[in-house]
Amino acid sequence: MQTVVLAAGRGTRMGPLTNTLPKPMLPVAGRPLVEHTVEAAIDAGATHVVIVVGYESAVLRDHFEVPVSFARQPEQRGTGDAVRSAVSELSREPFVVLNGDALYDRASLRELYETGPAVGSYRVSNPEAYGVLRTDGDRVTGVVEKPAEPPSELINTGAYAFPAAAQGWLDVGESERGEVELTDVLQRACEQAAVRPVSFQRWLDVGRPWELLAANEWKLPELDGRRRGEVSDDAHLDGTVVVEPGATVRPGVVIEGPAYIGRDASVGPNAYVRGATILGPDTKVGHSVEVKNSVVMRGTSVGHLSYVGDSVLGENVNFGAGTVVANLRHDDSTVRVTVKGDRVDTARRKFGVVCGPEAKTGINTS
C-alpha cells in the first residue's frame, strides 16, 4: 500500500538539537529516526513511500538510498497540508499516513495496513494530554484534542490507513491554531466509512530530547552486536555492542551494552560506556571518561576525566577535560525541564543536559 511519511517539520520542542538538523534525522540506534519509520512501513506492506520534506530538506533527500519519493511542503502549515503536498505522488488508491518522528511496533503496524480504514490507537493513563479517540464499539467516531474529560483512554498515534476517497477530503480549513489538521480529515473519514481502531502494543512520539533517549532505549537492544571496528584485546565489551568500521576501542575500555559506537569514533583508553548509549560517527571519548545512557552526536568530543549521564549532546560539541553533568534529583522527584517557556515533567528520575551543536565547555565545568 502506498504510504506518506510526514517529515517536514523542524521540531522546535527538540531544540537546540534541531537548529541545524531536522528532527526526523536525529539518531536512533545508529540510524535516523525517520529511517526506522520507513523500514517498519515497508515491512508492514508499503509498496510506495512518499516522504514529505520541508525544513532542511536536503539532509533527508541526501540520506535515503532506498527507492522513495519526496514531496515538498513549502511552509509548515500542519499535517493535513503536508499530506496535501504529497497527493500528486499518489495513485487513486487507499493510502497510509505515518509520522516520521514516531516509533511504532511492527506487528501493530502490519495490522493497521491489513485493517484499513483504520487509525492507530494507544492506551495511556493521561489521555487529556493527547488527541483522544471517540469510539462506538469497534468503530472510531471522531477525535477530540486534549479534552478536560477524555471520552476514552485511547489516544491517536498519528498512524492512519485512509480510503482512496480521502485524497479528496484534504480541502479542510484551518484549525484554531492556524494549521490544516489531518485529524479533521480523520473526522470526515469516520463519517464516510467504518474506521477501526488498531491498538498499538508499543508506540513512542519522539518530540522532546528525553524521548530521544527513550527511543534509543527501545531500539538499541534490537541491534545485532556486529563489531567491525578495531577493538583492543584489553577492552571488555558486554551485551549488545555495535562497533562500526573505522571506530577504535582502546585498552582498558569497558562497554556495557546496549551501545552503538559509530564509524571512525574513538573511545578511551580506560573509558566506561554503559546503558543505552550512542557515540555517533567521528566522536571522541577520552581517557577515563564515563558516558551513561546518552546520545553523543556526530563529531562531538568529550575530554578526559569527564562524566556524561542521561544527556543528549548535539553535533560537534566539545566538552573540556573534567566536565561533569548532573543528572539526578536527590528528593526522588522526576526531573522537570523548560520547553518553549513551559515547565514540563520528563517523568524521568535521571536527566542531564541537552547541549546544542557547536557548544563548548572549559575544563572542570560542572
Where are these regions (language model features)?
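Conserved N-terminal catalytic core of the sugar/cofactor nucleotidyltransferase
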Residues: Q2-V5, R13, L26-P27, R31-N99, ...
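Active-site glycine-centered loops adjacent to acidic/histidine catalytic or metal-binding residues
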Residues: G9, D101, R123, R208
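Short N-terminal binding/cap micro-motifs at the start of the first secondary-structure element
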Residues: G11-G15, E128
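Conserved beta-strand segments of alpha/beta enzyme cores
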Residues: P24, P67-S69, R139, A194-R196
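A residue-level structural signature of the nucleotidyltransferase/glycosyltransferase Rossmann-like core
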Residues: F95, G158-A159, L204
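Conserved core of the sugar-phosphate nucleotidyltransferase
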Residues: Y104-R177
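Extended, small-residue-rich solenoid/repeat segments and analogous flexible loops
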Residues: E176, R188-G275
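Flexible, glycine/small-residue-enriched loop-and-beta-strand segment within the central core
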Residues: W218-L220, I255-I261, V267-T361, T365
